[in-house]
């Protein structure tokens, strides 16, 4: 098999693959066997029709077509592996030359254009030191947690005064465009200052008492008229303020397992310290990835980026074409960072020679299923049927590569070496652990079995 590679862009290549007859012939033979299972030829048992008879009765063109459909994907994968190209998307394949008869010496030739991972050279991890902010717990942290707990036990009481920030107003809303009502809601409970509904609503409500009305111009954020300007009329039905319990021993015994307020505060301090250490570990992770990418120019595949940006916009607006410039810019920035991080972590996993077992992949998928309240077995089978096991293998590989890489460097805070072993764990030496390639191969078999089952 002859493979020529032409770099169209830093993240896009064109492969021209020419396959010798002796390498393509096994695919032709396999195609004849498959066709023989499906046709009835007088004088022969089904599935036992000689290849030459298949060529004569069915036609060599049909045989070659079947062989191309089955062979080109495999040959394409071999070409990628040979040239060490890591695809980021599905290829565009153009089959240019196919033999027209069993005696035709024409070589199979196809061209594959695909977006690829760019070449990335990571810095050496040996001797790398990364500074991370100290994990601190302040009195403010403890007081904030205490206040949050206090608010959980608060009650709403009606007040006879104008609404202020932090109050809860029961309101009726009516949106008009050109004098016509396009949306309305009644009896909505809204916390002033939360900014969780229409822009301008907080300002309009502040200072209004129960029974009073006002109007303002705002932009509708959902529905058929999303993004359009409308006259928003709002009526205040009632105003309630939050009444919080006193911070004393009685509150501590009611809100927790502790008898005194001092005991409760001490426990909150411990929880705050644990959270601070967790945030520090997250900061260490982010700083490590940033260190790997520092000084590197990492181009992202344009097509992959465009698809991910569109998907990102679908999460914030029903119609991506109506997204604002700010939304588009934010989506592009988010996607570019996500892609760069993914590519760097893939290279890191390869550099650290990460091993991924099938058990780890299935545990990873089971944890996702649990998060969404789904049956793990059903979720895993759906992933297999959709051919997405490869992506799961990749995600597990990235996570393990990240942990392995972080264990190889030194993290410091104010000159002192940090011990992040509680978050990074210990490097496992599992001789039975399978490689990423082996897990991927097993996944391919699972996908094939699922496809065969569906075909039945």
From Swiss-Prot:
Listed PROSITE patterns: FKBP_PPIASE
Catalytic activity: [protein]-peptidylproline (omega=180) = [protein]-peptidylproline (omega=0)
One GO cellular component term: cytoplasm
GO biological process, one term: chaperone-mediated protein folding
Signal peptide: none
Compartments reported by the entry: Cytoplasm
EC number: 5.2.1.8
Pfam families associated with the record: FKBP_C, Trigger_C, Trigger_N
GO molecular function, one term: peptidyl-prolyl cis-trans isomerase activity
Keyword Cell division found: yes
Organism domain of life: Bacteria
Annotated PPIase FKBP-type domain residues: 166-245
InterPro entries, alphabetized: PPIase_dom_sf, PPIase_FKBP_dom, Trig_fac, Trigger_fac_C, Trigger_fac_C_sf, Trigger_fac_ribosome-bd_bac, Trigger_fac_ribosome-bd_sf, Trigger_fact/SurA_dom_sf
Swiss-Prot/TrEMBL keywords: Cell cycle, Cell division, Chaperone, Cytoplasm, Isomerase, Rotamase
HAMAP family with a match to the protein in the record: Trigger_factor_Tig
Function summary: Involved in protein export. Acts as a chaperone by maintaining the newly synthesized protein in an open conformation. Functions as a peptidyl-prolyl cis-trans isomerase.
Domain notes: Consists of 3 domains; the N-terminus binds the ribosome, the middle domain has PPIase activity, while the C-terminus has intrinsic chaperone activity on its own.
NCBIfam families listed in its UniProt record: tig (TIGR00115)
Family: Belongs to the FKBP-type PPIase family. Tig subfamily.
Protein name, entry field: Trigger factor
């Amino acid at each position: 098999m002859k493979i020529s590679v032409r770099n169209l862009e830093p993240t896009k290549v064109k492969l021209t693959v020419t396959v010798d007859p002796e390498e393509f012939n096994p695919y032709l033979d396999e195609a004849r066997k498959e066709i023989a299972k499906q046709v009835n030829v007088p004088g022969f048992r089904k599935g036992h029709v000689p290849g030459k008879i298949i060529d004569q009765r069915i036609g060599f063109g049909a045989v070659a077509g079947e062989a191309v459909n089955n062979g080109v994907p495999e040959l394409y994968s071999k070409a990628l592996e040979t040239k060490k190209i890591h695809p980021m998307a599905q290829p565009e394949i153009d089959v240019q030359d196919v033999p027209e008869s069993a005696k035709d010496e024409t070589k199979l030739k196809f061209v594959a254009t695909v977006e690829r991972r760019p070449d990335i050279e990571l810095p050496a991890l040996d001797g790398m030191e990364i500074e991370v902010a100290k994990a601190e717990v302040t009195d403010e942290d403890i007081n904030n947690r205490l206040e949050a707990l206090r608010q959980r036990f608060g009650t709403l009481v009606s007040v006879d005064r104008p609404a202020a920030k932090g109050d809860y107003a029961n309101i009726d809303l009516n949106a008009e465009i050109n004098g016509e009502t396009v949306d309305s809601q009644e009896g909505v409970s809204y916390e002033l200052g939360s900014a969780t509904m229409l822009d301008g609503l907080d300002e309009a409500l502040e200072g209004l008492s129960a029974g009073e009305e006002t109007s303002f111009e705002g932009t509708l954020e959902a529905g058929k008229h999303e993004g359009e300007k409308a006259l928003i009329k709002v009526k205040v039905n009632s105003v309630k303020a939050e009444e919080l319990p006193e911070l004393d021993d009685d509150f501590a015994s009611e809100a927790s397992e502790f008898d005194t307020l001092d005991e409760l505060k001490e426990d909150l301090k411990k929880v705050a310290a644990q959270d601070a250490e967790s945030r520090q570990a997250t900061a260490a992770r982010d700083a490590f990835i940033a260190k790997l990418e520092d000084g590197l120019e990492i181009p992202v595949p344009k097509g992959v980026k465009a698809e991910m940006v569109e998907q990102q916009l679908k999460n914030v607006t029903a119609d991506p074409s109506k997204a604002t410039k700010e939304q588009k810019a934010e989506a592009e920035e988010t996607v570019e960072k996500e892609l760069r991080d993914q590519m760097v972590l893939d290279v890191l996993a390869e550099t650290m020679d990460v091993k991924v077992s099938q058990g780890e992949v299935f545990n990873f998928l089971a944890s996702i299923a649990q998060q969404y309240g789904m049956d793990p077995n059903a979720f895993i089978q759906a992933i297999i049927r959709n051919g997405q096991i490869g992506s799961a293998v990749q995600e597990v590989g990235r996570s393990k590569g990240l942990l392995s890489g972080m264990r190889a460097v030194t993290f410091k805070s104010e000159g002192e070496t940090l011990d992040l072993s509680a978050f990074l764990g210990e490097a496992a030496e599992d001789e039975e652990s399978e490689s990423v390639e082996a897990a991927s191969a097993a996944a391919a078999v699972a996908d094939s079995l699922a496809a065969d089952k569906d075909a039945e």
